[in-house]
């Protein structure tokens, strides 16, 4: 094949691949879309709406631990600090991505809740979700362009097309594209930083010191923005600094510059931002519970007495090492189940001719190893999570793996049949990597076409129409709803929501006291399928998750057995199981004689709102 014909073929493949990936994204966003299903995405969305309204970096999702932290801070300096539940400072998310979402929300008018309320008679999908998913989809498409240019720059266009094809039809990558999470944006930043790093390595090989400083400076800036998008990415930055310290001479000089950039652009803003809730050190300790606490960070976030939760420090470093190696074990799945990803480890033993490829290989390895340690210490085991960093290394791992497969084929002396065998190999790898997704795609399209008029939400546990409609009408903006789904209440109902604590005494003795001191009223309790959906662990899992409020969570399941909904399970809990407890019993809160005695079935027995006042007129 002549060079002209080969260039035309590559150009055609490039356009076909771009059209395929764009079409898949649009199908997800327009035809088979079911709304957001990630609590962090909803939380960031409601914070972004607050920003778009001019309320600053505030939240309507209130965590008990933050109430305790803010109250302790206010007690120490009552003249300087006040606990304002109407403008409750957000201290759990890095600031960059919510501001990007805020721009999208402002441009589309979704900062005005009343003007953009759902028409529950026509749709089950909140269009605000589609706005949030559109932002992540745009960044996903941009990441594909950056990945293509980076891989083509390192190897050639055939490897680039193959790598992007792997990513574009990976089910996990496409799920991230509509997840509303910041990972697609973070992927863009990582790829931009690696572009700068390649230029710095090339300049270093030519002894152009000024250019090395320029490109590394840009690389460090991109990494700083990455850290301000997700604090976990500081581990990636640390890996990059380690690489720079050993690769560039004089050793340590460029790494020291990177440390200075990180301190100025990341550490200082983070310290100022986290000061209201006890500072960076407190958030650091809280974060460790996500990996090493008894039940993860959720248990800690749902308590207003953090001193009562013990941190298991036994065999700390041994467990850290074990959790780190578990990240290696899950590498294939967490990087989209792409066939060539594991071959990156084989590429470590191959010496590439270009110094830039060699340098990037070790830089990516250093960043990934540090990220694995960070995910073991602070992260989660879920494949789709705001703290999952493995996805950021997928393009490089897949590219090096693909290159190694092609190198192995070239060494087999296939002669004129090389291109045909390479094409068949790529096709086979694509089928293996995306077979399940492609197999399910026709069914998803069929369901999407037949349900496109109203849509199917991610129920259980989420049902936006119930919150955007009835719950919003039943509740008041100035009062708080205690719920097991506060991120959804804050986003869909536009109401202040307290994450329901696991301990009854935590609520009645600590939180109620703080609310009374601040003149903040609680208007009711909302129980959703988040608490009572039976998973593999059954009732034991419900009890473990809901804690002392388990009877309230299980009441919905019991009510499903009684057609007239006349059973009140909480009535049985008029005394505490522990005779020494000074907490008020559960029945004093939610029963026929309790403070929140009015039971409202927002979505049958699946979603029950226990209100202080009679709001039955809105439940029609």
Where are these regions (language model features)?
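Hydrophobic, aromatic-rich transmembrane alpha-helices
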Residues: 242-245, 322-361, 365-368, 372, ...
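Hydrophobic/aromatic-rich transmembrane helices and adjacent perimembrane loops
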Residues: 176-177, 183-187, 226, 235, ...
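Membrane-embedded, lumen/periplasm-facing catalytic core of multi-pass transferases
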Residues: 32-36, 44, 415-488, 519, ...
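Start-transfer (signal-anchor) and selected internal transmembrane alpha helices
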Residues: 1-29, 36, 255-262, 355-361, ...
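Membrane-interface helix-loop-helix junctions at transmembrane boundaries of multi-pass membrane enzymes
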Residues: 153, 204-212, 248-259, 345-368, ...
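Signature aromatic-anchored transmembrane alpha helix within multi-pass, membrane-resident enzymes
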Residues: 11-20, 212-221, 238-242, 260-267, ...
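Membrane-interface transmembrane helices that cradle and orient dolichyl/undecaprenyl
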Residues: 154, 193-216, 226
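Membrane-lumen/periplasm interface segments of specific transmembrane helices
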Residues: 227, 234, 246-346, 435-439
């Amino acid at each position: 094949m002549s060079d002209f014909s080969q260039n035309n073929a590559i150009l055609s493949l490039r356009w076909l691949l771009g059209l395929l990936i764009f079409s898949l994204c649009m199908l997800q966003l327009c035809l088979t879309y079911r709304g957001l299903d990630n609590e962090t995405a909803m939380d960031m969305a409601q914070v972004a709406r607050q920003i778009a309204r001019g309320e600053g970096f505030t939240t309507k999702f209130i965590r008990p631990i933050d109430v305790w932290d803010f109250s302790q801070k206010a007690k120490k300096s009552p003249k300087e600090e006040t606990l304002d539940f109407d403008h409750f400072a957000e201290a759990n998310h890095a600031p960059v991505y919510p501001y990007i979402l805020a721009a999208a929300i402002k441009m589309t008018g979704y900062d005005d809740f009343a003007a953009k309320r759902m028409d529950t008679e026509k749709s089950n999908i909140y269009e605000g979700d589609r706005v949030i998913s559109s932002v992540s989809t745009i960044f996903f498409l941009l990441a594909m362009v950056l990945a293509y240019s980076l891989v083509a720059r390192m190897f050639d266009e055939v490897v680039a097309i193959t790598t992007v094809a792997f990513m574009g039809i990976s089910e996990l990558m496409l799920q991230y594209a509509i997840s509303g999470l910041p990972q697609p944006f973070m992927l863009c930043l990582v790829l931009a930083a690696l572009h700068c790093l390649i230029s710095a390595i090339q300049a270093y090989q030519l002894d152009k010191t000024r250019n090395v400083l320029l490109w590394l400076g840009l690389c460090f800036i991109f990494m700083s923005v990455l850290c301000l998008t997700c604090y976990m990415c500081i581990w990636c930055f640390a890996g990059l600094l380690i690489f720079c310290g050993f690769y560039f001479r004089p050793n340590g000089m460029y790494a020291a510059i990177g440390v200075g950039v990180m301190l100025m652009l990341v550490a200082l803003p983070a310290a100022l931002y986290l000061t209201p809730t006890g500072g960076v050190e407190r958030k650091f300790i809280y974060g460790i519970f996500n990996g090493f606490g008894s039940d993860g960070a959720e248990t800690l976030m749902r308590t207003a007495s953090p001193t009562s939760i013990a941190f298991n420090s036994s065999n700390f470093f041994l467990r850290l090492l074990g959790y780190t190696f578990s990240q290696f074990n899950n590498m294939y799945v967490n990087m989209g189940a792409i066939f060539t990803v594991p071959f990156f480890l084989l590429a470590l033993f191959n010496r590439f001719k270009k110094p830039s490829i060699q340098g990037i290989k070790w830089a990516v390895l250093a960043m990934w190893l540090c990220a694995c340690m960070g995910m073991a210490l602070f992260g989660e085991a879920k494949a789709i999570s705001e703290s999952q960093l493995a996805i950021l290394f997928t393009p490089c791992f897949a590219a090096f793996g693909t290159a190694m497969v092609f190198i192995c084929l070239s060494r087999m002396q296939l002669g004129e049949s090389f291109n045909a065998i390479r094409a068949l190999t790529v096709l086979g790898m694509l089928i293996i990597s995306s077979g399940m997704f492609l197999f399910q795609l026709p069914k998803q399209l069929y369901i999407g076409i037949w349900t496109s008029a109203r849509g199917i939400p991610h129920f259980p546990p989420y049902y936006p129409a119930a919150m955007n409609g009835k719950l919003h009408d039943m509740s008041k903006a100035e009062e708080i709803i205690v719920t097991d789904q506060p991120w959804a209440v804050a986003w869909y109902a536009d109401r202040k929501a307290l994450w329901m604590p696991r301990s009854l005494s935590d609520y009645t003795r600590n939180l109620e006291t703080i609310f009374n001191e601040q003149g903040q009223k609680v208007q009711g309790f909302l129980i959703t399928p988040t608490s009572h959906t039976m998973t593999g662990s059954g009732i034991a899992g419900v009890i473990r998750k809901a804690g002392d409020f388990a009877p309230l969570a299980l009441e919905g399941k019991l009510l499903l057995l009684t057609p007239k909904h006349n059973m009140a399970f909480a009535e049985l809990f008029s005394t505490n199981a522990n005779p020494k407890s000074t907490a008020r019993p559960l029945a004093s809160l939610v029963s026929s004689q309790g403070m929140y005695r009015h039971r409202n079935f927002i979505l049958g027995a699946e979603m029950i709102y226990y209100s202080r006042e009679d709001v039955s007129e809105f439940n029609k």
